[in-house]
Amino acid sequence: MSSKNKVLPKQPEVNIGTIGHVDHGKTTLVQSLTGVWASRHSEELKRGITIRLGYADMAIYKCPKCEPPRNYTVKPVCPSCDTKAEFVRAISFVDAPGHEALMATMLSGAAVMDGAILVIAADELCPQPQTREHLAAAEVIGIKNIIIVQNKIDIVEEKRARKSYEEIKNFVKGTVAENAPIIPVSAQHEINIDVLLNAIEEIIPTPERDETKPPLMYIIRSFDVNKPGTPIEDLDGGIIGGTIAQGKFKVGDEIEIRPGISIEREGKTVYNPLITEIVSLHAGEKSIKEATCGGLVGVGTLLDPSYSKADGLNGNIAGKAGLLPPTLSELTLETHVLERAVGTKELLKVEKINPGELLLLHVGAAVNLGKVVSIKKNMVTVKLSRPICAPSSSRVAISRKITARWRLIGYGIMLVDEPT
């Protein structure tokens, strides 16, 4: 079923996250849909788990002759009747790591997800710790369009598959995924992939985007594509990757990246925004002249590649020079605390936030430590360890250290709109 067509007919217009517990088959599912193994880094391949955010694109096609759900495919020719299929839309997948130690990476990816596929393995009891944690994270970030994939149905007997289904139904009761469809799938053998594609079309529509606003892109990856020993005159500039939340970018545009890079000045660390030019745009494995909202986009720049290597610009925002939100070193949040911490084996009550406490904050794709400096009812002011750039009213995921790990305890709405 997987599409081996690398070049998509159009730029992806929606980002779908694959979330869930480690080893439940998220990356295998993405491969069965896209033909791309999203865990491409050597350490990931060696350990068999996703460490960084994975990403892959696919096109959805619809056969004009076959009945649903069989009419949905990832190939331009219908595999059932050999009829030329009609292109529906292109999609980017963001494959989030399921290991508890990598929750911060999952939350950074959640910031750019328009919908999510929660993958739950039928051969394990539900919920596993990160199944619970990832669903809570999706709820906190505000992801409402969710599909549940009951994976690995090929390795369990029918009785266990039915029991697993009941466990899933009980687990999602009262959550944002209470009414989500539960689709039994074998990602390994590509069973029921057409049913999943049908559900994606029904449950995760392309959000309305405003392309008239000043462009704004969340950076979730950055690279140096040059091989060691490349002569200086042949070096390519740094590459940034992410999703455009509003507006559009064109080749030749001058852009600003905030908060930028840290430099030492008079014994203090300050952050300098970067100004550069877009020299190339890539989406869906092809070069484009203009990139619009939705999907994952690669942006070639004239930046010194030492800035962008090894995800060095992750968490920054890119936009037109002078039109980005202010850079902030302090945030005031209207906080909403969960009843129970998520991700722990035991269900622990969340205590109230205290002055002087250290919290881990996810603002857009940025992750940052913050010290609580004042509290007034549910308004919490936090001094950041390093500045961030984010639009006002952004949702901020809040984590606290519990049993030696950062655990999600709630979220806040950013109220600060002035540089500090």
Task: Enumerate the predicted regions with their spans.
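Conserved nucleotide-binding/hydrolysis micro-motifs of P-loop NTPases
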Residues: 36, 99-100, 123-126, 152-156, ...
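P-loop NTPase switch module centered on the Walker A-proximal segment
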Residues: 2-104, 113
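Conserved Switch II/interswitch segment of TRAFAC-class P-loop GTPases
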Residues: 87-92, 96-102, 110-134, 139-162
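G-domain G4 guanine-recognition motif of GTPases
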Residues: 121-123, 144-162, 182-193, 315, ...
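Conserved catalytic-core segments of large NTP-driven translation/proteostasis enzymes
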Residues: 8, 170-313, 317-324, 329-337
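C-terminal effector modules of nucleic-acid-centric enzymes and ribosome-associated factors
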Residues: 15-18, 156-158, 304-420
